[in-house]
UniProtKB/Swiss-Prot annotation:
Keyword Aminoacyl-tRNA synthetase: no
Keyword tags: Cell membrane, Membrane, Transmembrane, Transmembrane helix
Keyword ATP-binding: no
An annotated GO cellular component: plasma membrane
S-S bridge residues: none
Protein's UniProt name: UPF0344 protein SERP0557
Coiled-coil residues: none
């Protein structure tokens, strides 16, 4: 399920940037805007489902005495929810022709923070390199 989660958020980031850039302030939406936005929502939903599944698995492992990064996992979950919310807000503001650059950059910064937290979690590459679990 971890690979599904990683694949879904990578595709969601690519689709977010493509959707955001396919709406012009002068010409409006391109013909690709609506399918891209719907695919983005599909991958955001898949990211949410797989992320919650991973969170539940980690909490169940902790109840058996195996895990213990609840605070970091909860922080990553909150950052992930904020990323998805800011993705939708920035696209909606761009569609309404309001200033959306601030929300776009907030989303990019939150994506980087969420990815950094994910990298240092027990299933992340840094933990595997140094044998931290």
């Amino acid at each position: 399920m971890l690979h599904v989660h990683i694949l879904s958020w990578v595709l969601a980031i690519i689709l977010f940037i493509a959707t955001y850039l396919n709406y012009s302030k002068t010409q409006g939406a391109s013909p690709y805007y609506k399918p891209l936005h719907m695919a983005l929502r599909l991958f955001m939903l898949l990211t949410l489902i797989s992320g919650f599944w991973e969170l539940i698995e980690e909490f169940m492992a902790a109840s058996n005495g195996e895990g213990g990064n609840h605070m970091l996992l909860t922080l990553k979950m909150l950052c992930g929810l904020a990323v998805i919310a800011f993705m939708e807000i920035s696209i909606a503001k761009r569609k309404k022709q309001q200033t959306s650059h601030k929300f776009f950059w907030i989303t990019i910064i939150l994506i980087i923070i969420t990815m950094a937290i994910g990298v240092i979690l027990p299933w992340g590459p840094i933990s595997k390199i140094f044998g931290i679990s």
